[in-house]
UniProtKB/Swiss-Prot annotation:
Family affiliation: Belongs to the ivy family.
Pfam families: Ivy (PF08816)
Protein name: Uncharacterized protein PA5481
Recorded GO CC terms: periplasmic space
Organism: Pseudomonas aeruginosa (strain ATCC 15692 / DSM 22644 / CIP 104116 / JCM 14847 / LMG 12228 / 1C / PRS 101 / PAO1)
Compartment annotation: Periplasm
Length: 155
């Protein structure tokens, strides 16, 4: 009987670990430019953010640029789905980094613009303009800033 109980516990633990691994892998299935059409919660959070912002380009308003896979970020128990997007014709000069609360209630962004024609020997990070969207708290700002700095072309 004890053997059967141990076997059942092992099976349950294995199933739980497997489902956690699948959930962790699924975050990479999403891309920022697909979220609005696939999930009403993300769409509403993004619409709430952009309605309070002025003078944003269409590709930012509609999340219609070129996107990288999104990933989960856990910051001391607060979880976010984070991803990046850039303007299709100007990925080096026009970027957007976005974090959604895990419950999809809020979206936050970092809109980054690098001046056109910046010489290759100039650091984009020293010449860029940064605009926070959605009034992110310092912890979310740090997450988005780290996402930007993780790009090997950002120096």
């Amino acid at each position: 009987m004890r053997l059967m109980r141990n076997l059942m516990n092992a099976l349950l633990l294995g199933a739980a670990a497997s489902s956690l691994a699948v959930a962790a892998d699924r975050d990479g299935e999403y891309r920022l430019n697909e979220l609005q059409s696939t999930d009403a919660g993300y769409r509403k959070a993004w619409q709430n953010l952009v309605e309070d912002e002025s003078r944003l380009p269409d590709w930012v308003m509609n999340l219609s640029g070129t996107a990288t896979p999104m990933h989960a970020v856990d910051d001391q128990g607060d979880k976010y789905l984070v991803g990046g997007l850039c303007e299709k014709s100007d990925c080096k000069g026009q970027r957007l980094l976005v974090a959604f609360d895990w419950d999809k209630s809020h979206a936050y962004g970092l809109y980054v613009q690098v001046p056109e024609g910046l010489p290759q020997d100039k650091s984009p990070s020293k010449h860029a303009s940064f605009r926070w969207l959605g009034k992110p708290e310092p912890a979310v700002q740090k997450i988005l800033d780290e996402q930007l700095k993780a790009d090997p072309n950002w120096y």
